C-alpha cells in the first residue's frame, strides 16, 4: 500500500463511486468550510495505481493555542473491512496532522452499525478511541450518528406508496392544490434566505446569513451537486382549479337535493356544504392574493445536495402563509423525483434520534422524517486518534466541564 498524489477530480470520483462516500468528503465541500475557519488537505492511498482509500482532512485552530483539530468528516472513504488500507490511511493522516500540529484525528465514517463489526474491530486495534453509541443528535458528536433515509429507486406510485398513510394523503392533496415547484438559480437564494429567516423566527433558532448559502451553492452547483428548489403559489391558475372544484361541488349538492332526504343523504349534504364553505374561503383568499401579488408568492424552499448515488435534503425553509397548500410536501416529493432522475437511489433527510420521547426537543424532527418511507441509518459513530494526550484531555474533558459550570453559574445569577 502506497501514498498517492491525486487530483481533486480523481478524489471526488472515488468518493462518489464508493459505498462509504459522502457529501462531506467532496473536495468542494471543504471550500464551503473556509468561512468558518476550517482549511483542508487531502490524502489517498492505493496499490498498483489503483486508489483504495481517500480522506479529506479538515483543520481548525484551537483558540489561543498553536494547535489544531484534524477532522475527517464522514471519512475516511475506504473499505473498513480492509485493515491494511485503514492502516495506510491512518499513517498518512498522522503525518499530515502532525505537520499541522493537530492534537487528535477525529473521524465519523459513513458505515452503518449492522455492517460495522469488522470496522469497529479494526479501528480499535489501530488505536482509535470510540466515542460510544449515543443518541443520534448527541452534542458529543459533530455529525449526527443517525439519519433518516428514503430509498427512491422506484416509480412515482411506488414512492408515494412507501410513505405513511396520512402522509400519502397529504402529498396527493399538495399535488392537487396546484403550487409550482421550481428549480431555481443563485438569485433565488435571496428568496430562500428570507424564508429561512421567517422559519428561524417561527421555530426559535438562529439562521445563517445569505453568504453561507451562496458559499455552498457556488462551491457545489457547477458540478451538479447542489440545487435550490422553491415552491411558488401563483393565484390565477390555482383560482381556475378552485372555480372548477366549486362548480363540481355545487353540482353534487344539487344532485343530492333532488334525492330522497334520508339520513344518509342529509349527512352527504352536510359534508358537501362544509366543502363548499372551505372552497369559497379559499377562493376569497386567492382573489385577494391575485390583487396584491398577481405574480404569486414563494412559500417554501430547500437545498438538495448530491454525492454520487446519494442525495441529501440539507436545508429547508417555509413561509407562515398559505400553509394549507402543503408546499413542503409538494417540494419533498418533487426533489425526490429530481434526485432519482439524476442518478440518486437514496434521499437523506439528515440527523435524528431514534424514536425519542414526545417531550424531547428532537421529537418533532423524528416525527416529520419518519413518515417519508424512511429507514434509520445508524452509523458506527465518532472515533478519535489521540496525538497529544494532555491537550486532548484539556479540550475534550476539562473545557466542556468548565463551560457547563459557567452556564450553571450564569443561570443561577440570572435567577437571583
Curated annotation (Swiss-Prot):
Major localisation: cytoplasm
Superkingdom as given in the UniProt entry: Bacteria
Where does the UniProt annotation locate this protein?
Answer: Cytoplasm
TM regions (residue ranges): none
Protein's UniProt keywords contain Transferase: yes
Mind listing the GO molecular function terms for this protein? aminoacyltransferase activity
Q: Which residues form the signal peptide?
A: none
Supply one GO CC term from the record: cytoplasm
* InterPro entries per record: Acyl_CoA_acyltransferase, FEMABX, PG_Glycine_Bridge_Synth
Q: What's the EC number here?
A: 2.3.2.16
What reaction is this protein's catalytic activity?
beta-D-GlcNAc-(1->4)-Mur2Ac(oyl-L-Ala-D-isoglutaminyl-L-Lys-D-Ala-D-Ala)-di-trans,octa-cis-undecaprenyl diphosphate + glycyl-tRNA(Gly) = beta-D-GlcNAc-(1->4)-Mur2Ac(oyl-L-Ala-D-isoglutaminyl-L-Lys-(N(6)-Gly)-D-Ala-D-Ala)-di-trans,octa-cis-undecaprenyl diphosphate + tRNA(Gly) + H(+)
Q: Which UniProt keywords apply?
A: Acyltransferase, Cell shape, Cell wall biogenesis/degradation, Cytoplasm, Peptidoglycan synthesis, Transferase
Q: Does the keyword Metal-binding apply?
A: no
Task: Please list the GO biological process terms of this entry.
Answer: cell wall organization; peptidoglycan biosynthetic process; regulation of cell shape
User: Could you say which protein family the record assigns here?
Assistant: Belongs to the FemABX family.
Which protein, by its recorded name, is this? Lipid II:glycine glycyltransferase
Origin organism is: Staphylococcus epidermidis (strain ATCC 35984 / DSM 28319 / BCRC 17069 / CCUG 31568 / BM 3577 / RP62A)
Q: What is the lineage of its organism?
A: Bacteria, Bacillati, Bacillota, Bacilli, Bacillales
